[in-house]
Amino acid sequence: VTTVGTCPYPFGDPVRLDVHPSYARSRAEQPAMRVRLPYGDECWLVTRYSDVKTVLSDSRFSRARAAGREDTPRVTPEAAPAGSILSMDPPEHSRLRRMIARGFTARRVREFRPRTQEIVDGLLDEIERVGPPADLVERLALPLPVSVISQMLGVPPAEHHRFRDFSAMVLSTTAFTREEVVAARAGLEEYLGELAEQRRRVPGDDLMSALVAAHDDDRLSEQELRQTGITLLVGGHESTASQFASSVYLLLSRPERWALLRERPELVPSAVEELLRFIPLGSGGAFARYAVEDVQLGEVLVRAGEAVVASTNSANRDDRVFADPDEFDLTREHNPHLAFGGGVHVCLGAQLARGELQVALESLLTRFPDLRLTTPAEEVPWKEGTLLRSPRELPVTW
């Protein structure tokens, strides 16, 4: 961390689940620092929990002002488009979120849990039938959330593969060219337009049907309809898949932790929360926000019009909030992590993701108690050039 000038950010290429030491130095010495991301202008990076929470939740920081701007600091070639719920501020954000939230109520998520269990059981049945070794990324981590969010949105099973490929490109930082990313987003928008037309002709009890009805009542524009579909599809499966694959990798690379969960399955809910806190899922990129007025963050005055990036990965390792933050503690009780963000943009699907992670982990422990990696942990291949870090493959046996 430099005290003068601008530091390149992200600090370095992610290495497995390591958190770059520059975050700890920043929290200690310079919790708000000037950085330059691969695309866009310079901005502030905040690394302490309290400042990160402020940026995420304070209405003086705007996401809408970052939408569609070429000068927005970012790690992806393409700027976040306008019309997405991720790129809105209240009251527009509140209007759209209320509509979508009906599909993610606690009751609806609770009712969907048995279906999640059925999907997991089916995937594990197939893994058991084929026998070891198995790639848990391809056989479980990816197909589970794809199936869950697809069923909630009303995507036919035969179409699941289409948006799996699309979303991998939409989340690209360097793995694909800008032209490929733009084409992928356009293709996904086109598919969602087709799906909306299908649901218009034959409505169902699914989220896309509800969004189409809202659009036809003039409560949702065509752009909002398609961008919301993209957000739900990509956010609803890629992040959960990456989190689950990284979680199993972490547990199997520390066999004593896997054994603890096997012996004490009642710890799974708290283990999922600790996995969410401990795993730095994002590879360093975050949505920039713009200050709409001067805001004091610690000793730094962020001027109106300046961009700020908040690192939840760093906040989740802040020793001002978490005891022994670099320890992976499955019995941790005080755990107010920010893995799902905060403020009005806190992840809508947080409870759905928690449910999927819990069901999948509980089932894996029960069905394959002796699960282990087939290669040394340091030889497991990881994805590169994408927003979310995760094993590319997770070869296991039992």
Describe each model-derived feature in a short phrase.
Residues 1-398:
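Cytochrome P450
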